[in-house]
Amino acid sequence: MYQRSLFRGVAQGLKRSSVRFQSTSSGSSNGNFFLRHWKLLSVIGSFTAGVAIYDMSDVRSFIHGRIEMPLFHAFTTPEFSHRVAILAASWGITPKDRVADDPSLAVEVWGKKFCNPIGLAAGFDKQADAISGLLNFGFSYLEIGSVTPKPQPGNPKPRYFRLKPDLSVINRYGFNSIGHDAILAKIQKRVRKYIAKTSPQLLKQFDANPASCTDPAVLGVPRSLIPNKFLGINLGKNKNGNEIEDYVEGVRTFGNFADILVINVSSPNTPGLRNLQKKSALSTLLTAVVSERNKLNSPHPPVLVKIAPDLNEEELTDIADVLKKCKIDGVIVGNTTVQRPKTLKSTSHVEETGGLSGPPLKPIALNTLRTLRKHLSSDIPIIGCGGISSGKDAIEYARAGATMVQVYTALGYDGPVIAHKIKQEILAELKGKRWVDIIGKEE
């Protein structure tokens, strides 16, 4: 409908221009055509350029999905195209979802009202470069990171591989991060700019103590700085860092600037990291994390834990016990998988070391989510993540017990329209129901 109305407007405008053109061009010679009609041609050119620019500023434009994405996939490496996308979003030249979210998509959790249940998982905006640009794609929740205390380059390149027949990727980035200080500086600069525009009387207070001005009640918006949209900060550890202190330092550094904190103990690309999912180690870590979180200025951000999809039922039962004991606010299921399902069609890159994401991950992550939901206290929400690229996928996660969902790989294949597409497909599947009505309601 959007494309039809847009091109109908173009056609009508050109028709009117054509009438004027015909009335003034009769008898003119080819030699002085442009001189005689430069004003008319300028109007037509400006009009056409304006329409094209407006069209490209909307995530629904066919240009993004039908032209840009295939070109990127054909002529660039995955990591290069990822970097270009982040740069474009950071410069504010990426499109926006211009359709208001239907109220039936809203979900309230941790005392926060999300305008829709679709988030963008950590790993896309690792260095907090493009918070506003990515949220403008139509997501209600963005996780930056994973962020490590000290800068580290991650694993050597190449470390990101497309499995095109499976619409999947394998990555072994290895927590490449510019470190706490650099990322905190970016976030504080963004908040200061917002305060200067909306509440300049707070600038002196902010400059003296930035953390004192980040209460959403003071800002008037969440810490994402966008109404009904939220900023998560995903915390990791350095390759040779301290298993407890790295996360505690992350809570201390970012707790007053995040709507949500996520403890990532599940990346397969940092040696030994997944050992932190074991009952004793996880309990020790989360006890320290929650204690540090409780020292922050109020309101305290909820603490979530991101776990792997490769855990067995005994391990998931242990994790459920720890989450309840440590009073953790939520859990994300899950990260990438080290498994290589037999359903994979790709022949190249399949044996690369790293975590697999995309549609082949979905049945693995869904099974993990269902198993955890059986053992997890009902008051601890789950965010589902893994292979989600359609409204049907999202609804399958919701019925399995996910309060919200996240996408990652689908953004790289479908482009900026993905959040809009999933939301519209959810609405079609809901058939008048609300998202919250189907959570945990298996058919």
From Swiss-Prot:
Reactions the enzyme catalyzes: (S)-dihydroorotate + a quinone = orotate + a quinol
Annotated NCBIfam families: pyrD_sub2
Bilayer-crossing regions: 38-54
The protein's name: Dihydroorotate dehydrogenase (quinone), mitochondrial
GO cellular component: mitochondrial inner membrane; mitochondrion
Record flagged with keyword Ribonucleoprotein: no
InterPro entries, alphabetized: Aldolase_TIM, DHO_dehydrogenase, Dihydroorotate_DH_2, Dihydroorotate_DH_cat, Dihydroorotate_DH_CS
Cofactor annotation: FMN
EC number(s) stated in the UniProt entry for this protein: 1.3.5.2
Catalytic machinery residues: 267
Domain of life of the organism encoding this protein: Eukaryota
Keyword list, A-Z: Flavoprotein, FMN, Membrane, Mitochondrion, Mitochondrion inner membrane, Oxidoreductase, Phosphoprotein, Pyrimidine biosynthesis, Transit peptide, Transmembrane, Transmembrane helix
Lipoprotein among keywords: no
Chain positions with Phosphoserine modification: 168
Coiled coil (UniProt feature): none
Gene name of the record: ura3
Subcellular location: Mitochondrion inner membrane
Membrane-topology annotation of the record: Single-pass membrane protein
Binding sites annotated in the UniProt record for substrate: 126, 171-175, 264-269, 335-336
Top EC class, one word: oxidoreductase
Pathway annotation: Pyrimidine metabolism; UMP biosynthesis via de novo pathway; orotate from (S)-dihydroorotate (quinone route): step 1/1
Note accompanying the cofactor annotation: Binds 1 FMN per subunit.
Residue span of the annotated presequence: 1-21
Binding sites annotated in the UniProt record for FMN: 122-126, 146, 234, 264, 306, 358, 387, 408-409
Functional note: In the de novo pyrimidine biosynthesis pathway, catalyzes the stereospecific oxidation of (S)-dihydroorotate to orotate with reduction of flavin and the transfer of electrons to ubiquinone, which is part of the respiratory chain. Does not use fumarate and NAD as electron acceptors.
